[in-house]
Amino acid sequence: QDTNNLQSRILQLLRKDCTNIAVVGDDAQSIYKFRGANVQNIINFPDLFDDCKEVELVENYRSSKEILALANLSYENFATEGFSKTMNGQFSTGYKPVLMRPDTDEAANIEVANGILDLISIGVPADKICVIARKSRDLFGVEHLLNQHQVAYEKRGGQKFLELRGILDMIAYFRFASNPMDEISLFRLLRLHHGIGDTYASNICELLGIVDNPIINNKYTGFKFAEELRRLHQVFETAKTIPNEDVETKFALFEAFYSDTCARAIKLMKTDEATRTEKYEELESERANIQQLFLIAQQYHSITEFLDALILEQARVEDDKDVKKVVLTTIHSAKGLEFDTVFVLGCVDGLFPQIPIWEMGEVDDSDEEIQEELRCFYVAITRAEKRLYLVCPRTAVFYTGVFKTRITRFLDGCRNTYQESDSYIRLE
């Protein structure tokens, strides 16, 4: 089910003078369209090869009957093509999957983290607990809380939160604002500006403690990038006027300056337009990551408290290979895996399936992108063996503000297959 058109054509040519061929696949788990995979290769297989014999493998030895009841019904309700089949579970747990509906994204992350702590306390091995999200950045909130609780985890399908470039850049602003002698942070920030390379940045950093305000009091006042240095100096002067407790305002100041600085650097860089466009797209992705950092920062009473928490997190990043770890993963990296307990984040219509706000209500469920999202949903929920938690906060932060959410459409018509709760509930 994950083959592309070229691979399908090669298969047809190899089979040209031979009738012996067998393939195994599941059209419901074809989720690599973005890599060129074409689900039609398996759907149309009986038409492409004469005298094709179909054998249905419908016995599922992984998930409970309760989890499969939800998976089967959801897929049956929304799939507009493919093979019709019902997966049969081999055991029952006696409890249905849980739809968790906390008030906010932050509350949802807290409930998931508390759930993980509870599961570990009752004997569920950490490496048999998995948190799945559509995108890697959607895992940042849970990742932050696990760090706080000193719960070991491994990240699949993306870098760890505190390893991301944009996150490290933003932290550097806060660190230098709190400690103007922080040479490492200043060097990082100087390198963001167009025209300032390693040598210039190092020379300026060497002036720390020797002259006042080395960002503007240096030998480069006549250079082309002098205006960039003046801007950097000014943003820190402005930051001094903002109380340490006003986390939101200070964060907004640095985020706006960072975005503008990076955009200016991209605009002025000598490159072709295709590369420039790619750089702008990378910046937008970094800004989305920074939005997640902002949601975390809002939970603290001051910048100092926020930085102290981040320092502790970074100290815990070192991996202990002998410790069992909770798995945080994207859907695409979870395929083929199985876990005792699975939390699926972001079960919000518009996020899962991914539909831009301005297109809500205009996209037909038969659209191939929606069908791909349905298959992603199916893969996510069928990673669970015994316990499945679907997380849909009642409000969520989108680009233009905070909105009331709608439960993912993939649960429409499935109400009898799950139970609903405002918070985590223990299933045993």
Summary of predicted features, one role per range:
Residues 51-53, 59-151, 177-179:
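Helicase P-loop NTPase motor core
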Residues 219-338, 354, 417-421:
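Accessory C-terminal helicase-associated subdomains
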Residues 1-41, 59, 63:
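Conserved helicase NTPase motor core
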Residues 48-49, 91-96, 124-247:
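ATPase/helicase motor core of nucleic-acid motors
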Residues 17-20, 26-28, 49-54, 93-97, ...:
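Short glycine-/polar-rich loops that comprise or flank the Walker A/P-loop
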Residues 2, 24, 135, 192, ...:
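Conserved helicase core region in the C-terminal RecA-like lobe
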Residues 170-181, 365-373, 382:
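Conserved RecA-like P-loop NTPase helicase motor core
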Residues 395-428:
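Helicase C-terminal subdomain and adjacent C-terminal extension
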